[in-house]
Amino acid sequence: MTNKILITGASGFIGSFIVEEALNRDMEVWAAVRKTTSRKYLQDKRIHFIELDFGSKEQLKAQLGEHEFDYVVHAAGVTKCLDKADFRRMNTEGTKHFVDALIELKMPLKRFVFLSSLSVFGAIHEQQPYQDISEHDMPRPNTAYGKSKLDAEKYLDGIGNDFPYIILRPTGVYGPREKDYFLMAESIKKHIDFAAGYKRQDITFVYVLDVVQAVFLALDRGMSGRKYFLSDGDVYSSTEFSDLLKKEMGVKWMLRIVAPIWVLRIVTFFGEKLSQITKRPTALNNDKYNILKQRNWRCDIEPACDELGYHPHYKLADGVKLAVEWYKKNGWL
């Protein structure tokens, strides 16, 4: 019997790759979308579409009531908003409404995978030598995004083991179709590389297909209530990503500008004010300031490796090469 899977955030960067892998596994794939959602990466005719309104539990129950899903991957969410309250409304309350609807409908789920983020921990272990952030550490999110994801995690934790959920906490996810790291590529194409802060920064990354690998491992064998960090297993300096972009793009030279943290604070302050005027979300906001200010992004992926059988296949050099090839092929660069 074919397994039926519902994927929220299906039109997004990570979600669209999850859809593709589910199709490769011959699952019956249902992609949760909004009326205004672009379906550019959801062209396969085997995909079923369902419109979901995460703002209302009762509306979700009506929309989901005629369906039975074996698996759910909740990848929907927002990473930047005009109003900080929207993070909670969409990432926290939206998740709560969704889970409550599934429970009240007695959805016969085998597993529910929630895509959270390393950002739920914020700036901890910031004194050198930096230590890996582990599941035993106390989260102290320093961004509105991280707090909204942590609050969603806490809600899931409060439900109990009757709801079979697994939480994945990827570090910075990059790859084809991703737009935020792409901004770095655009800047380097113009021979400019911008960094903030003079203190050593340890950064981690995970290629999008390794996140997808972890999602399906969690669906297959994840223990309810467990949480797993995801990275490629290595730690990088603050310049390695841009150096690899420069190499793969064939840029012969670039000017590396390292600004004090206080300059970044000014830039993001005015970026946020401009966003409020134009009514368009921007990556240059207070959350971005706290993200770039943070020095330690190490995380412990051993539990994911030991319990799920997760083994990252893409080191940063491999992933950047593939991402740049895609950017060029699709006319982004």
Segments from the language model and where they lie:
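Conserved Rossmann-fold NAD(P)-dependent oxidoreductase catalytic core, especially the SDR/UDP-sugar
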Residues: 96-144, 166
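N-terminal Rossmann NAD(P)H-binding glycine-rich loop of SDR-like oxidoreductase domains
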Residues: 5-25
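NAD(P)H-binding glycine-rich loop region in Rossmannoid oxidoreductase-like domains
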Residues: 48-93, 97, 118, 122-123
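Substrate-positioning beta->alpha
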Residues: 151, 178-183, 196-219, 225-226
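Mid/C-terminal beta-alpha module of Rossmann-like enzyme folds, strongest
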Residues: 218-284, 317, 321-324
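Conserved C-terminal active-site "lid" loop/helix of NAD(P)H-dependent oxidoreductases
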Residues: 208, 243, 267-311
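Active-site Tyr-X1-5-Lys
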Residues: 140-166
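Amphipathic terminal alpha-helices
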Residues: 299-307, 311-333
